[in-house]
Amino acid sequence: MLKIEHLKKSYENFSLDCSLEVKRGHVTGLIGQNGAGKSTTFKAILGLISYEHGDITILGKPLAQFTAKDKQDLGVVLSDSGFSGYLTINDILPIMENLYKNFDKSFFLEQVEKFQLPCDKKIKDFSTGMKAKVKVLTAISHHAKLLILDEPTAGLDVIARDELLELLRDFMTKEEGNSILISSHISSDLESICDDLYMIHQGTIILHEDTDVLLSDYALLKVDDEAYAGLDKQYLLRSKKESYGYSCLTNQKQYYAENYPQIAIEKGTIDEVITMMIRGAA
């Protein structure tokens, strides 16, 4: 559905070098700190910024050959864009009908009613959660095949985030083959919906893994200096010096559980995996 190969973009104090793939029928997450390169990647995918090197293929077509007609199959949410705050939902309806030949007005209005969004109130007067719902609803209401969502849950409370994620789950079950690329710095959001995750740091992908594998096979080993010295390190991804000795990140939890029953092994959260990949030593 989407493939990026060696995408390179340079700014004065930042360089992006990114490769990733979103498979058909998959939800793929891009997670990283603010400023890690998520938004730059998304803008390059959509042709909103130029880039120095790399290949981007969307729905089987090179980006350079992607037409306005092809864009009908994309649903997009960007963190710094959307409809004018001076428009109402009633104003948006004819715009959507003109933009997208497959705009499902009845579905859109059904969701508007479900979320109790006022149709005659200016969007600038909506709450943060209401604005986010409008963005996502416009992305999913024209039978897109691929959603590209940059931080759609940013700034939302737990309830609003859960409601948005439920919309995305429904999108994935609507039509076979639908796919999503979604970014966030909130790991729990991506953990609950993504099939696989890419972790980006300072413009570079530092880890790609299936979400199930991250949650089942990754772990933190907590060992003192003596235990660390005697540890088989072939399955350690990162190590970090601590006051008690070392914390070590592995993707082979079972190996260490079987061969080192005396050491402390903790299930690593995605946040802990990210922290270790960034701050730990290889």
Q: Whereabouts are the PLM-identified features?
A:
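Helix-to-loop junction immediately C-terminal to a conserved catalytic motif
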Residues: 46
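ABC-family P-loop ATPase nucleotide-binding domains
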Residues: 72, 78-135
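Walker A (P-loop) phosphate-binding loop of ABC-type ATPase nucleotide-binding domains
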Residues: 32-37
